[in-house]
Amino acid sequence: MRERAAGYPLPPHGHHPNFVGAKEAAAALLAHPQVAAHRTLIVGADRALYPLRKLALAAGVVLYLPDQKREGWYFRVDDVAGANLKRSREVGEPKLRPEGATAAVLACVAVGPGGGRLSKGYGWGWNGLPALGLPTYTLAHRRMLLNPLPCPPDSWVRLIGLPGEVTECPTSETGSLAP
């Protein structure tokens, strides 16, 4: 917070931190060819992902947002108003499965250059979405990049959207993320 890198809500304790430059990081990630090809995404409900939700919906991408009150449920949203979580209940359609989703964007607390993602340790998406087998991406401020990570990652991401750029994470020959 002393560096003025954290954004609302403050303090960032207890949730994935929002950060200054999140909109630029979202724009960079959405413009990356690996992400731009997806027309339906699962996107976390974290404040740091609000700019990504808004930009994606404005570009015609369909989003599935996790229902914060019913575990395992999503809201299918195609209206820009649904980028705001309070409005997603009004404009979204409740779904048990994210039908047609081809990738996911999850928030992080920290991420390593190799794609290891640390979450807040609980809640939706804390350990990624392994059961769905989808490529996963994240947004981060440069101060959230740690090498090495202080503990084993919760999950792995293929791309890290940073303000103004995207970092590609190494993959194995089979396309799965390198451990």
Language model regions located:
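Surface-exposed, charge/polar-rich loops and edge strands
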Residues: 1-20, 24-39, 58-62, 71-179
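Structural motif
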Residues: 43-47
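Alpha-helix N-cap/helix-start and coil->helix boundary motif
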Residues: 49-50, 125
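A short acidic, amphipathic alpha-helical/loop segment
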Residues: 51-56
